[in-house]
Amino acid sequence: MQVSIVNEHKYRELEPLNEMLVKRGGVKMIPEPKFVISGLVDNEEYVIKLRIDLADEFRYSYQNQQWTPFAPSTKNSKLSAITETEHRKETGATWNMRIVQFDKLLITREFNDIQRNVIHVEPNHKYIPVLTIQNVTTGKSTEFQFQQMEFIAVKSYQSARIRHTKRAPRKMNLAPGSSQKPQLIVPDILHSPTYGFTAAPPPFPFEYWLLYPQIQYQIQQLAYSLPMGPPMVPIHHIQCTEASQRVYAPEYGWNSILMPGAHKEQDDHYMFHHEIWAPQDHELEKLHVLTEQKNKPSETPQ
């Protein structure tokens, strides 16, 4: 029977001593414990368990960029051995072909949070995971320990190198299943599928595909285009050539404001033409109307 660690290179990056962050409510272990087992009897049933034991009887402190023991361990430091997580029993042939991982395992620093798949660890103490393989058919159990999996439980990371190593993968949220090969996501970003004029169909409360099947089946775009026109031209892109006309009149000079009707500004928004007059234009227009009425010959009754 042989047992090996799957992600052993991650533990090598955290040497000489890993730090495991623990919080209230429980957090997952980083790296996650994963094992590969070989040499089990195919027709016999096994149960695989994992617990966390206290590595020694000391309490540690971080000084001069290293962990050193300074006091005996506390009473609650041994409570981790009372809880363990296990998989359901499977045949040896199944375990030989499977990666054994404990993704539901959580570690906490609060004794009240102890429950199934939640193990209590005391901060500033050294622990080591213990893998137990129990043969249900014969009743024998075998335990495995790996020194590179030892860790110090901490409330906050003390080593800057370990803090950077564990938080670096969280800088870019990758798609599920692509964390091992982030370069595979780049073609998807550069060449994202399009649905007509939109990058992606928005969510609708009704069945949107019944109205526009060409969004779901892109081949139908050849015969049935989407019922939407080209985008509206922005207003500031419309150039009005009649808005800056200046007319010279000898009696007024180049002052177009005093000339009634000589300088008109047009608003071409959405193809509607509106003449915009200045206040002087209105005053001159009124004066022009009054002058025309005064000079108009009066009609005398015959």
Curated annotation (Swiss-Prot):
Superkingdom of origin organism: Eukaryota
Q: Which InterPro entries does the UniProt record give?
A: p53-like_TF_DNA-bd_sf, T-box_DNA-bd, T-box_sf, TF_T-box
Q: Which SMART domains match?
A: TBOX
Looking at the keywords, is Coiled coil present? Answer: no
Cite a single GO BP annotation. regulation of transcription by RNA polymerase II
Where is this chain's protein located in or outside the cell? Nucleus
What name does the UniProt record give this protein? Putative T-box protein 34
Tell me which species this is from. Caenorhabditis elegans
